[in-house]
Amino acid sequence: MTTAVILGLLALISYLLGSIPTGYLLAKALRGIDIREHGSGSTGATNVLRVVGKGPGLVTFLVDVGKGLGAILVARWVLGQAWSPVPAGWFEFVLLAIAFIAVLAHSKPIWLGWRGGKSVATGLGVLLALNAPTALATFGVFLVVLAVSRIVSLSSMTAAIALPFWFWFFTQSWPFVGFSVIAGAFVIWRHQSNIQRLLAGTEPRLGASQG
């Protein structure tokens, strides 16, 4: 296979994994509802937790993390094979491109008319595969802010802002830092409605029935 074919297949696999609508499928199976018509309208773990329950919310979170993790692990395995024609010098940039495709796919799944989640859990999975210390430190920021504020959206956006600093601290890699700026900005952009509610003082805290 040519380099273009390999890269195209990796991009397709990453998109297909990232776009699996975990929360939507669970809500349909367990409650017979379209999760996008309830709560915040997101298919992500937080909305599933509020609308469907803690168990489904946790399952959604874990599967969504696994989607991001799996996309990078598959790409890393393929790129590391002797039969792969992709130049070794492209390795880092290909992984970062695959990572962003997985993040994008979670938010923009073709199966649901491009309406998905906010890519936080899938982004965490991607980070775990790219650089585990960065992932854990960023998740730590999320947990600290969540413990203080009990607002998931604020915690997610704060973690996204902290991400480039952690990537630089652990990797000193400008491509990784650049990726984190773009991916973090995308996650924050996906939280536009949450930002409006935060400014209005109406964003629900963890445990509320709506969000």
From Swiss-Prot:
Its EC number is 2.3.1.275. It is an enzyme of class 2 (transferase). InterPro entries: G3P_acylTferase_PlsY (IPR003811). The chain crosses the membrane at residues 5-25, 55-75, 85-105, 126-146, 168-188. It is a multi-pass membrane protein. Keywords: Cell inner membrane, Cell membrane, Lipid biosynthesis, Lipid metabolism, Membrane, Phospholipid biosynthesis, Phospholipid metabolism, Transferase, Transmembrane, Transmembrane helix. Pathway: Lipid metabolism; phospholipid metabolism. It is found in: Cell inner membrane. It holds the Pfam family G3P_acyltransf. It catalyses: an acyl phosphate + sn-glycerol 3-phosphate = a 1-acyl-sn-glycero-3-phosphate + phosphate. Belongs to the PlsY family. Catalyzes the transfer of an acyl group from acyl-phosphate (acyl-PO(4)) to glycerol-3-phosphate (G3P) to form lysophosphatidic acid (LPA). This enzyme utilizes acyl-phosphate as fatty acyl donor, but not acyl-CoA or acyl-ACP. This is Glycerol-3-phosphate acyltransferase. It comes from Thermosynechococcus vestitus (strain NIES-2133 / IAM M-273 / BP-1).
